Amino acid sequence: MFSHIHPDNYDAQLSKKQQDMAKLFSDFNLPAPDLYPSVPLNYRQRAEFRVWHEGDDLYYIMFDSKTKEKFRVDDFPVASELINNAMKALLATIKDQRELRFKLFQVDFLSTLSGELLISMLYHKPLEDNWQIEAEKLKAQLSTIAPVDIIGRAKKQKIIVDKDYVMESLNVGGKTYVYQQVENSFTQPNAGVNEQMLLWAQQATQNAGGDLIELYCGNGNFSIALAENFERVLGTEISKTSVRSAQINISENGIDNIDIVRMSSEEFSQAMNGERKFRRLEDFDLTTYNYDTVLVDPPRAGLDRDSVELVRRFNKIIYISCNPETLKDNLALLVETHQIDKFALFDQFPYTDHIETGVILTRK
């Protein structure tokens, strides 16, 4: 099933993506795109597998996206080497361990460039005290591969051995940034390309000055790397988990000019306009911010109409998109007031139809 995933095929698939993007955005007067390729193998830091039980045997499976048929997975060439090593070691260790094996239906892996690993094991059964005892033994055995933590999940249960996050280190422009990444929260899966995205955004905002507002800031991925280019940064995020991670990451990186508030872009727009007062903003005077630059990294649905109207109020817009189709729709509105200065293609997902794009727009 993975025969197409090979370094010999990488350049051709990337070239096709360039052609597809040029065709999709042909109605816009785009500058020549900046292109940021991925390494051709072992680039994903996250992977999820179902577990198939067959007599005494058990193995990972995935499902064909077109036929929906299951297929066996012993190696996963797009995942990090650390994940591939852990995949094999985990099954070999639990194969004859009933407490860890019985009713196990899924395993999720989260690894880092810094060499840490988090494994989540999902069950169709309640987890008893014996499960934790055996999970601690499993952790000790797998720790010969890398620093590892294990999470057991069942209905209304979550057992952590010993933490539910990893600490990633990303090198951007010769500087290392540290990020807490929590299980089940969003992180960029291709860490190498993420480093390139952060560098591109850093360089695009050099000497920008003023303040940066980031909507959908997640764990502070962009805000932290861009903080040095701005006087102040204000990030908004609706996930409590991501807000907590962002606060930790701000502290870990010794940054003192970022604030994070938990609210949606719609709520932030209402606060900016003075339409509503929020207790969460009691310590912030939004009238003191210089609303010059905004960064948005929305979900696949893109920006809704109200959010488009919000970002149009800024002189500079940095738009990171995981869905070119919704980006195209949003750009059709944004180019009425702004011009496209930079356009970038980030190959976050080689050998798939998906591509991450970045656009810098400035007011006409």
From Swiss-Prot:
Pfam family, one: tRNA_U5-meth_tr
SUPFAM superfamilies: S-adenosyl-L-methionine-dependent methyltransferases
Positions with a binding annotation for S-adenosyl-L-methionine: Q188, Y216, N221, E237, D297
Catalytic activity: uridine(54) in tRNA + S-adenosyl-L-methionine = 5-methyluridine(54) in tRNA + S-adenosyl-L-homocysteine + H(+); uridine(341) in tmRNA + S-adenosyl-L-methionine = 5-methyluridine(341) in tmRNA + S-adenosyl-L-homocysteine + H(+)
Keyword Methyltransferase: yes
Positions annotated as active site in the UniProt record: C322, E356
Keywords on record: Methyltransferase, S-adenosyl-L-methionine, Transferase, tRNA processing
Gene Ontology terms describing biological process: tRNA methylation
Protein's recorded name: tRNA/tmRNA (uracil-C(5))-methyltransferase
Species: Colwellia psychrerythraea (strain 34H / ATCC BAA-681) (Vibrio psychroerythus)
Lineage: Bacteria, Pseudomonadati, Pseudomonadota, Gammaproteobacteria, Alteromonadales
